Amino acid sequence: DEGLCGAFNMNLFKRTLEIINQARMAETENPVMFVVYPIGKKASKFAQKLVGDNVDVTADEMTAKSSAEDIARFTGELTREFIAGKVDCVEVVYTHYKSASKQILATRQLLPIAADDLATGEKVERNKPYLFEPDVNTIYNEVLPLYVLSSMQEAICSNRVSEQAARVMAMQSANDNAKELLDELQLEYNKLRQQSITSELLDIIGGKVD
C-alpha cells in the first residue's frame, strides 16, 4: 500500500512477471490464462499494466491492513472460483518473513492443496489407524477451508511484517547515508574555511610587508 520500503514492492512485481513469462514460454496449443488479484494500491497499479491477451485483473478492496472478515471473504471468493472450475490453480506471491534483516520472496500454491503441504514429516506407525467421526469426508470439508484460510492469513501477515521490516531497513540505510553525506560536507566546509582563513592571513602578512 505504501512506498519508502526499498525494492520490496518491485521484487514482488518481478516475481509475478517471472511466473507469467515462464508459463507463456511453456505454452503448447492452449495458452495459459491468468487472473491477477492485487492486494494493495501499489500492486493494483502494477497489475493494470499486465492486462493483455491472456492476463486479466480482478479489482478488490483488499489491502494489507484488511480485517480478518475481509480476508475470509476474499479467500472464500477464490475458493468458490476454484471449485466452480473457473480457475485450475491459485498461487499467492508474497514475501516470507524470516527475521528483521532477512525476508524471502515466496510463491505458495493455495489451491489445489498439495499433498506435501499436509504431510507431517516423520511417520509414526504406532499412531495408526485413525478413527474419524463422523467420517473422513465430513472432516475434510470442514478442516480444509480453514486450512486454506489460515494459509492466506499467514501469507498476508508475513508479507505485511516483511514490508515494515524492509521499510525500517530502508529508512535506516537512508539515515546512515544522510549522516555520511553530512560528515563529508562538514569536512569539505572545514577545508574551505581553513583555506579562506589561510588566504586572509597571507593577505594580511603581505600587506604588512608592503
Predicted segments, located by residue:
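C-terminal beta-strand-loop-alpha-helix "lid" module of Rossmann-like NAD(P)-dependent dehydrogenases
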Residues: E2-D210
